[in-house]
């Protein structure tokens, strides 16, 4: 089984905030002591952090559920509960995180040590010391902790490489990478020897260095899923320069120029922006019989494609096996990299507006009313449900406070307008109460 994994689906759940406490001072010589219940601690958030030592999402193959710890409950003497530590999850450089439900990109993690909160922990509930007023100096009110955010996420790894090698299978991409770097890709005399991307660091004789990625071979129709399809082409999206490797020996009966055109069509079909990247044509296997004649014919065909105003791509004849022409290729690649800017995969507008967000947008609909099959009125809505779960239903004063909040939101009036009558059942989740007109 391959140990390389570049996509994963995970679920994350932040910790719930600790419940606030209802407590009163019980001290000698202090009659009728006031409220003394502290707030609950915050729940732990779930945070993704980039680890440059990771190269794959393999850790997420079997471990797909992550849950941070909840905060501790508030205590007497006005002491707050302990907040929970955040859950830090390491991901490799180049990990894109999407919300699985909306498909929206949350973040693109590319820098070592970069962090992003994917699920924010709930705040602790307030203790009764927070609700004291001149009219009610000893309130028996405390809030439950706020639930932590839950999310289903899709992770996609697009490896960070400056240069990407593309071409048909068996044109010598892996051999080239193994010769110019310390990478040890699998090499064989058959198609699709490379079934996962390989990454190597290249250093030129002039001292320049860059990362080079060898991708599994493409064939005609890859954009429609033929062969290995384009499942690994995502890894070329971050590259700044493409080395298009072509077998000039034509030993398998293929035409080098037709190969060149076919691969570019597949790149364009996958992502139009790939064609914005500068290409260097690598004419490989020049030590084979007939390669020089094929190269001359290739240049003539290429010249026909470009008019007088277009600049022909650079062509470097090499032999990876014989170590011929490699130095000039690498120097030219380094020079091209030096004058080529990074290609941003995502604009700021592509990202979700916020990290895990718990406020209520002003335009958010506060609640919705529907009718159940048993004729009960059902209240729903994010804001209303959050207020409900933070209400301590074991305390009458907390329930009365929640009733006032519903009235302030306009729930009572809305129920009347919908035809609710005295004694009708109103339901929030599994909790039921009677409507009083």
Curated annotation (Swiss-Prot):
PROSITE patterns named in the record: G_OBG, GTP1_OBG, OBG, OCT
Cofactors (names): Mg(2+)
Residues binding Mg(2+): 174, 194
Alphabetically ordered keywords of this record: Cytoplasm, GTP-binding, Hydrolase, Magnesium, Metal-binding, Nucleotide-binding
Location of this chain's protein in the cell: Cytoplasm
Location of the OCT domain: 359-437
Alphabetized Pfam families for the sequence: DUF1967 (PF09269), GTP1_OBG (PF01018), MMR_HSR1 (PF01926)
Domain of life the protein comes from: Bacteria
InterPro entries assigned: G_OBG (IPR031167), GTP-bd (IPR006073), GTP-bd_Obg/CgtA (IPR014100), GTP-bd_prot_GTP1/OBG_C_sf (IPR036346), GTP1-OBG_CS (IPR006074), GTP1_OBG_dom (IPR006169), GTP1_OBG_dom_sf (IPR036726), OBG_GTPase (IPR045086)
Broadest EC class assigned to this enzyme: hydrolase
EC number of the protein: 3.6.5.-
GTP-binding in keyword set: yes
Chain residues that bind GTP: 167-174, 192-196, 214-217, 284-287, 319-321
One annotated Gene Ontology cellular component of this protein: cytoplasm
Keyword NADP: no
GO biological process, one term: ribosome biogenesis
Residues of the Obg domain: 2-160
Predominant subcellular localization, coarse grouping: cytoplasm
Family: Belongs to the TRAFAC class OBG-HflX-like GTPase superfamily. OBG GTPase family.
NCBIfam families, per database record: Obg_CgtA (TIGR02729), Obg_CgtA_exten (TIGR03595), PRK12296.1 (NF008954), PRK12297.1 (NF008955), PRK12299.1 (NF008956), small_GTP (TIGR00231)
Function, as annotated: An essential GTPase which binds GTP, GDP and possibly (p)ppGpp with moderate affinity, with high nucleotide exchange rates and a fairly low GTP hydrolysis rate. Plays a role in control of the cell cycle, stress response, ribosome biogenesis and in those bacteria that undergo differentiation, in morphogenesis control.
Quaternary structure, from the entry: Monomer.
Protein name: GTPase Obg
């Amino acid at each position: 089984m391959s140990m390389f994994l570049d996509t994963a689906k995970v679920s994350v759940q932040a910790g719930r905030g600790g419940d606030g406490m209802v407590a009163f001072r019980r001290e000698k010589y202090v009659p009728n002591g006031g409220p003394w219940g502290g707030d609950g601690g915050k729940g732990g958030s779930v945070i993704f952090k980039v680890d440059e030592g990771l190269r794959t999402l393999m850790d997420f193959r079997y471990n797909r559920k992550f849950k941070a710890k909840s905060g501790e409950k508030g205590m007497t003497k006005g002491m707050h509960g302990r907040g929970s530590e955040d859950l830090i999850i390491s991901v490799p450089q180049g990990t894109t995180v999407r919300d699985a439900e909306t498909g929206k990109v949350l973040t693109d993690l590319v820098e070592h040590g970069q962090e992003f909160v994917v699920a924010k922990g709930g705040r602790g509930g307030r203790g009764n010391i927070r609700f004291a007023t001149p009219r009610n100096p000893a309130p028996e009110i405390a809030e439950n902790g706020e639930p932590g955010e839950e999310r289903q996420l899709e992770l996609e790894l697009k490896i960070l490489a400056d240069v990407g090698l593309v071409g048909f299978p068996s044109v010598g991409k892996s051999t080239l990478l193994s010769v110019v770097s310390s990478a040890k890709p699998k090499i064989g005399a058959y198609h699709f020897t490379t079934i996962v991307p390989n990454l190597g660091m290249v250093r030129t004789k002039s001292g320049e260095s860059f990362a080079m990625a060898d991708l599994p071979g493409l064939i005609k129709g890859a954009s429609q899923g033929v062969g290995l399809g384009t499942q690994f082409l995502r890894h070329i999206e971050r590259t700044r320069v493409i080395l298009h490797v072509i077998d000039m020996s034509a030993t398998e009966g293929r035409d080098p120029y037709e190969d060149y055109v076919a691969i570019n069509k597949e790149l364009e079909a996958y992502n139009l922006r790939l064609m914005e990247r500068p290409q260097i044509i690598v004419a490989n296997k020049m030590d084979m019989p007939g390669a020089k004649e094929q190269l001359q014919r290739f240049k003539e065909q290429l010249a026909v494609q470009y008019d007088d105003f277009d600049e022909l791509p650079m062509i470097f004849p090499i032999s990876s096996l014989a170590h011929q022409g490699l130095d000039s290729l690498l120097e030219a690649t380094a020079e091209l990299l030096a004058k080529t800017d990074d290609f941003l995969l995502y604009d700021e507008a592509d990202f979700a507006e916020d990290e895990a967000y718990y406020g209520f947008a002003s335009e958010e609909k506060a609640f919705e009313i529907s009718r159940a099959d048993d004729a009960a009125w059902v209240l729903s809505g994010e804001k209303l449900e959050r207020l409900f779960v933070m209400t301590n239903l074991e305390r009458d004063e907390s329930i009365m406070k929640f009733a006032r909040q519903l009235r302030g939101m306009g729930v009572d009036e809305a129920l009347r307008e919908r035809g609710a009558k005295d004694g009708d059942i109103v339901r929030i989740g599994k909790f039921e109460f009677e409507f009083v007109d």
